[in-house]
Each structure stands twice: as C-alpha cells, then as structure tokens.
Amino acid sequence: MTNRMELSGTVVKDPIRSQSPAGISHCRFWLEHRSVVVEADLPRQVFCRMPVVVSGKGSQDITQQIVLGSNIKVSGFVAYQTGRNGVGKLVLHADDIIHI
C-alpha cells in the first residue's frame, strides 16, 4: 500500500512547537493550498487547508524557519486523527519541507 502526499502552499497559522512527555519534539501548523488543475478538460480552481505535523529529533532543524506566511512544499504521509472533541481530520505528517 502507498501513503505519500506532496502539497505546496502558505502557512496560515503560527506554528506551535511542543514536546511530548516522552521528549519527542513536535511542530504543528496549517498549510493552505490554491491552484488551478484541469479536470474533464476544464480548468478547476482547487483550495484546501490541511493541518501539518513534523515530529522527531530532526523536526526543529526542518521547522526553525517556518513562520506565518512561509511558502513551502511539504512531503509526508496522511493519517486520520480524532481530536479531544471527537471530531476527526486528515493530518499530513511531514518528513520533508522545502521553502519555495
């Protein structure tokens, strides 16, 4: 099975950096993507906002320059997470981020 996603866009919420009780570093932010793609031979405007999380000891190096308004390309895998309020969402777990 394959679970790989690449998405470019703009950081639209300030990154939140934290550390788990086990000492694992995390950085969470929201990425907004806008583009035009061709579907059924017609141009279609595409928009999405997706939460992104970067975890692990290398996360600080990858995310230290990410701020509100950064234009980046994120690669990673997608997982479903349920929040404390019971509402679920897809989250992009990034392992590579490039500033564009």
Swiss-Prot record:
Q: Give me the Gene Ontology terms describing cellular component.
A: primosome complex
SSB domain residues are 1-100
What are the protein's UniProt keywords?
A: DNA replication, DNA-binding, Primosome
* Key word DNA-binding present: yes
Q: Which domain of life is it from?
A: Bacteria
Q: Which GO terms describe its molecular function?
A: single-stranded DNA binding
One family from Pfam that matches here is: SSB_1
What InterPro entries does the annotation carry? Answer: NA-bd_OB-fold, Primosome_PriB/ssb, Prisomal_replication_PriB
Any GO BP annotation: DNA replication, synthesis of primer
Keyword Cell division in the entry? The reply is no
What the record says about family reads:
Belongs to the PriB family.
Q: Which NCBIfam families match?
A: PriB_gamma
Subunit structure comment from the entry: Homodimer. Interacts with PriA and DnaT. Component of the replication restart primosome. Primosome assembly occurs via a 'hand-off' mechanism. PriA binds to replication forks, subsequently PriB then DnaT bind; DnaT then displaces ssDNA to generate the helicase loading substrate.
Protein name (Swiss-Prot/TrEMBL): Replication restart protein PriB
Native organism is: Vibrio vulnificus (strain YJ016)
